[in-house]
């Protein structure tokens, strides 16, 4: 499989927010008696795991498919290019959030920023893939 396009975006704001929350939980845990401490430490660990899973978003386009994965690749998605009937560059509202979000009318995959590429699929579904290189990704998808 020949990769025609590949780009990784670091989720800086997400990392800073989640790791800061984990540090706050862990620091607060040491001020509490033992029973309450474990809940906060578990919360801190959960935030670190989520930060690791959503630390980046890598998007690649080959001659036949589009793939995207979060962080180390445990959350991985793919679709055939022939299933994409429309490609456009869009700007999301900050209210759409980050991560994997189901919004009215589309599903969003994003780690940082508001720019995205909207994909209209043959079956009528709409996907948005957030990226800081929306024009480059859209151009790679249009070259199919």
What are these regions (language model features)?
Residues 1-33, 108-116, 126, 134-137:
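N-terminal membrane-targeting/pre-transmembrane regions
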Residues 12-25, 39, 46, 50-55:
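Short, small/hydrophobic-residue-rich motifs at membrane-helix boundaries and re-entrant hairpins
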Residues 33-41:
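Short, aromatic-rich membrane-interface segments at the entry and exit
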Residues 40-52, 98-102, 106-109:
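Short, solvent-exposed secondary-structure boundary motifs
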Residues 69-133:
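Non-transmembrane, membrane-adjacent beta-strand/coil modules in membrane-associated proteins
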Residues 141:
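Short, well-ordered, aromatic-rich surface patches in folded extracellular/luminal domains
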């Amino acid at each position: 499989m020949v990769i025609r396009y590949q780009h990784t975006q670091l989720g800086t704001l997400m990392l800073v927010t989640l790791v800061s929350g984990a540090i706050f939980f862990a620091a607060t845990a040491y001020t509490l008696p033992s029973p309450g401490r474990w809940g906060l430490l578990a919360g801190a660990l959960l935030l670190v795991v989520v930060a690791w899973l959503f630390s980046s978003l890598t998007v690649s386009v080959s001659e036949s498919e589009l793939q995207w994965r979060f962080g180390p690749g445990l959350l991985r998605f793919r679709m055939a290019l022939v299933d994409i009937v429309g490609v456009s560059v869009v700007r999301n509202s900050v209210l759409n959030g980050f991560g994997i979000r189901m919004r009215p009318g589309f599903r969003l995959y994003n780690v940082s920023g508001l720019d995205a590429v909207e994909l209209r699929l043959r079956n009528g579904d709409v996907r948005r893939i957030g990226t800081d290189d929306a024009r480059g990704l859209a151009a790679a998808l249009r070259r199919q």
